[in-house]
């Protein structure tokens, strides 16, 4: 073991070795009694010094308390008592070993006596039994006792250490000192406790002197001072009563004021709640108004965007040339095309008459559309677009024309089919002019008449622009428009049945390159006519024509 203060190894006092359970309990109980007694003595002495009238400890008890010796001064006998409990305990191994050895000796001797009795009985009954060797039994018993004693001695040392450790732990838990401690540490501890005890005694004496001084001062008060004090107390009592009445009146006034303030507070709280409700209502109305404004602004912005989109769409629609979008005139190799239909045929690439008739039907439909939209009055002609079987009605000019015609039309009108009839016709054999050739010639006449009337319409638009313009810039623009749109000149000259010197008549023969080229020139003039008509139709005569009049060929889309 080690000292719990300086941590140096310790050698236990011989009196602490081999303690029985009863001795250890007595040691622990004495320590607790001494501690409690010392505390009671110190407290009783302090009470006695503070109050002489309190209960006192008899002197006989104090004398007996002073005669109590320290546990180290006790000369305890190291007797191995056999009065322990029947339960085998680790710290009573020595006693149990003695009890066990004694019981075994008694048992051995008892067995020997029993055997002797049995032997005597057997000798008297049988006469043939043998006697045991007593020396061998005693030797075996002695060997067993020695072995058990060695085991008990080795077990007793660890048991004593554990027992003393438990004792020291219990002592440490009951006091403020950690056990075990060495002799030097114990002396230092005793000196420290003595100094603390002396300081406590001095402090107790100081308080006792102060208490006795106060008691002596209280006894020195005379009767006269008491009477003066009594009269003074009476006057003070009257003053206090008056002050009490005054304070009661003031309290009543304050209570009334408090009631008024409570009522005012309730009224103000109600007004506060009302104002908060009004504020919340205003905020709600304002939020609703803001929400409506936001929704209105969104709708307005949406309408503006829709309006701008509609304007843009309208501008796009205005810029769209309905004639160009509806009638797409282009070319495909040596052939001129209208809406993808080839107008013409050559031996190297034969085009069926159905496709040629359909292209001519589209051409008649285009001319009829221009006449209708621009309100062109063709007095001597009437277009009848009927697809691949379109016709032209021509007014009869003289009787010769009427006599040569085989059609008995009502009135003075001659109906000319603008399609090639593949049925047998006698005129084809003699290479004479057919009604199909006459219809193509009439088509050239109609295009020339439309060109003349469009030039007249453009001139009238130019004169109206000049009269309505007020500033110089607009007049200049009008002059430019007049120069550019008043006169329509087609790229290829048309004269009777020829266009640019090429005849449009077949005279019953099959289409050839010359006729195909003439049809190409025809569609080119019609495309120019279409562009000019688009400008007039859109009322935008200040814009330049969509087709360059210097270009005399059909450009592809």
UniProtKB/Swiss-Prot annotation:
Residues 189-322 form a coiled coil. Residues 135-147 have a biased composition (Acidic residues). InterPro entries: Atg6/Beclin, Atg6/Beclin_C_sf, Atg6/beclin_CC, Atg6_BARA. It is found in: Endosome membrane; Vacuole membrane; Preautophagosomal structure membrane. The modification Phosphothreonine is found at residue 142. The keyword Membrane applies. One of its GO terms (cellular component) is phosphatidylinositol 3-kinase complex, class III, type I. Pfam families: APG6, APG6_N. Keywords: Autophagy, Coiled coil, Endosome, Membrane, Phosphoprotein, Protein transport, Transport, Vacuole. It is a peripheral membrane protein. Residues 93-149, 218-238 are annotated as: Disordered. It comes from the Eukaryota. GO terms for molecular function: phosphatidylinositol 3-kinase binding; protein-macromolecule adaptor activity. Gene3D superfamilies: 6.10.250.3110, Autophagy protein 6/Beclin 1. Residues 515-540 are annotated as: Required for membrane-association, autophagic function during starvation and normal autophagosome morphology. Residues 320-539 are annotated as: BARA. One of its GO terms (biological process) is phosphatidylinositol phosphate biosynthetic process. Required for cytoplasm to vacuole transport (Cvt), autophagy, nucleophagy, and mitophagy, as a part of the autophagy-specific VPS34 PI3-kinase complex I. This complex is essential to recruit the ATG8-phosphatidylinositol conjugate and the ATG12-ATG5 conjugate to the pre-autophagosomal structure. Also involved in endosome-to-Golgi retrograde transport as part of the VPS34 PI3-kinase complex II. Belongs to the beclin family. PANTHER family: BECLIN 1, BECLIN-1. Present with 2490 molecules/cell in log phase SD medium. The C-terminal domain called the BARA domain is dispensable for the construction of both VPS34 PI3-kinase complexes, but is specifically required for autophagy through the targeting of complex I to the pre-autophagosomal structure. Component of the autophagy-specific VPS34 PI3-kinase complex I composed of VPS15, VPS30, VPS34, ATG14 and ATG38; and of the VPS34 PI3-kinase complex II composed of VPS15, VPS30, VPS34 and VPS38. This is Vacuolar protein sorting-associated protein 30. It comes from Saccharomyces cerevisiae (strain ATCC 204508 / S288c) (Baker's yeast).
């Amino acid at each position: 073991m080690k000292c719990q203060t300086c941590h140096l190894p310790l050698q236990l006092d011989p009196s602490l070795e081999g303690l029985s359970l009863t001795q250890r309990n007595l040691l622990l109980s004495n320590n607790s009694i001494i501690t409690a007694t010392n505390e009671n003595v110190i407290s009783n002495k302090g009470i006695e010094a503070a109050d002489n009238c309190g209960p006192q400890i008899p002197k006989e008890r104090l004398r007996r308390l002073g005669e109590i010796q320290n546990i180290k001064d006790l000369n305890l006998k190291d007797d191995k008592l056999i009065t322990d409990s029947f339960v085998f305990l680790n710290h009573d191994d020595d006693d149990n070993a003695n009890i066990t050895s004694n019981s075994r000796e008694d048992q051995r001797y008892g067995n020997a006596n029993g055997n002797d009795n049995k032997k005597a009985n057997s000798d008297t009954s049988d006469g043939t039994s043998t006697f045991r060797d007593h020396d061998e039994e005693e030797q075996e018993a002695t060997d067993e006792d020695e072995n058990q004693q060695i085991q008990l001695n080795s077990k007793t040392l660890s048991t004593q250490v554990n027992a003393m450790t438990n004792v020291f732990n219990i002592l440490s838990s009951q006091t403020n000192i950690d056990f075990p401690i060495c002799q030097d540490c114990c002396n230092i501890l005793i000196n420290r406790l003595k100094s603390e005890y002396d300081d406590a005694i001095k402090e107790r004496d100081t308080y006792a002197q102060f208490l006795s001084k106060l008691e002596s001062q209280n006894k020195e008060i005379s009767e006269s001072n008491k009477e003066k004090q009594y009269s003074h107390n009476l006057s003070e009592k009257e003053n206090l009563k008056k002050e009490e009445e005054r304070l009661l009146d003031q309290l009543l006034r304050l209570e009334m004021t408090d009631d008024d303030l409570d009522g005012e507070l309730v009224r103000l709280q109600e007004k506060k709640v009302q104002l908060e409700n009004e504020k919340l209502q205003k905020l709600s109305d304002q939020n609703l108004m803001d929400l409506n404004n936001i929704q209105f602004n969104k709708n307005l912005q949406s309408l503006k965007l829709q309006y701008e989109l509609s304007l843009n769409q309208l501008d796009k629609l205005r810029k769209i040339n309905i004639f160009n979008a509806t009638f797409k005139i282009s070319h495909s190799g040596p052939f001129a095309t209208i809406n993808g239909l080839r107008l013409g045929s050559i031996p190297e690439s034969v085009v069926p008459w159905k496709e040629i008739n359909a292209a001519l039907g589209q051409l008649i439909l285009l001319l009829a559309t221009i006449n209708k939209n621009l309100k062109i009055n063709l007095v001597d002609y009437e277009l009848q677009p009927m697809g691949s079987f379109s016709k032209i009605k021509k007014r009869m000019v003289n009787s010769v024309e009427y006599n040569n015609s085989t059609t008995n039309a009502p009135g003075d009108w001659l109906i000319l089919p603008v399609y090639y009839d593949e049925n047998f016709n006698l005129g084809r054999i003699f290479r004479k002019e057919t009604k199909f050739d006459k219809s193509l010639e009439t088509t050239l006449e109609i295009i020339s008449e439309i060109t003349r009337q469009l030039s007249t319409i453009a001139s009238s638009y130019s004169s109206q622009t000049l009269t309505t313009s007020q500033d110089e810039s607009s007049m200049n623009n009008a002059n430019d428009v007049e120069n550019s749109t008043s006169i329509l000149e087609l790229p290829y000259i048309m004269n009777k049945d020829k266009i640019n010197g090429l005849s449009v008549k077949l005279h019953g023969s099959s289409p050839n390159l010359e006729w195909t080229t003439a049809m190409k020139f025809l569609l080119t003039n019609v495309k120019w006519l279409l562009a000019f008509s688009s400008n007039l139709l859109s009322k935008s005569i200040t814009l330049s024509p969509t087709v360059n009049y210097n270009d005399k060929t059909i450009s592809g889309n």
